[in-house]
A protein has these predicted regions:
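N-terminal alpha/beta PP-like core and its mobile active-site loop of ThDP/TPP-dependent enzymes
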Residues: 2-178
């Protein structure tokens, strides 16, 4: 009988560490607006046993669903979408969360830096797109260039920024290569 060894994946592992840290901190609800670029994010959160995932095809509806989950539970909800205008559709719910001091952790998938600014479809400048409506924002490194401890640290900062003094939404932009 042979034992199988888990296969390490340089893209998935930091994202899974991020999701696991949020779960360890008390996050329970994740709202996913599916898209191809956000697949690694969606899979990492969906497969974590302590997290409940809710699939919402319409991003605007997803944003308000996550807002309602966070209001009802008092815990941050995670919101995940693909790149481009999908992220723009979250803005109304993020503005509402900002003014109502509702914690949300918004994770937007994006193209890697070398593919930005070329006029490709579903491409907008996502870095800082929610500016004054979030407590903290980060344009993260490409996951394969990132360590699991750094991912856990980013998750902790996102969580603490969302639930700390002046509770509200935070934004993490995830550049993902296909």
């Amino acid at each position: 009988m042979t034992e199988s060894t888990p296969v390490s994946d340089p893209v998935y592992d930091p994202i899974a560490a991020f999701a696991g840290q949020l779960a360890a901190l008390g996050v329970r609800d994740v709202v996913i607006s599916p898209g191809s670029r956000s697949t690694p994010l969606s899979l990492a959160f969906h497969t974590h046993p302590a997290l409940r995932t809710h699939i919402q095809l319409d991003e605007r509806s997803a944003g308000f669903f996550a807002l309602g989950q966070a209001k009802a539970s008092g815990r941050p909800s995670v919101l995940i979408c693909t790149s481009g205008t999908a992220a723009a559709n979250y803005l109304p719910a993020i503005v509402e969360a900002n003014h109502a001091c509702v914690p949300m952790i918004v994770c937007t998938a994006d193209r890697p830096p070398e593919l930005r600014g070329w006029g490709a479809g579903q491409t907008i400048d996502q870095v800082g797109m929610y500016t004054t409506n979030v407590r903290w924002a980060a344009d993260l490194p490409v996951p394969s260039d990132w360590s699991e401890p750094a991912a856990r640290l980013a998750a902790t900062r996102a969580y603490e920024s969302s639930v700390g003094a002046g509770r509200g939404p935070v934004h993490l932009n995830w550049p993902l290569r296909k």
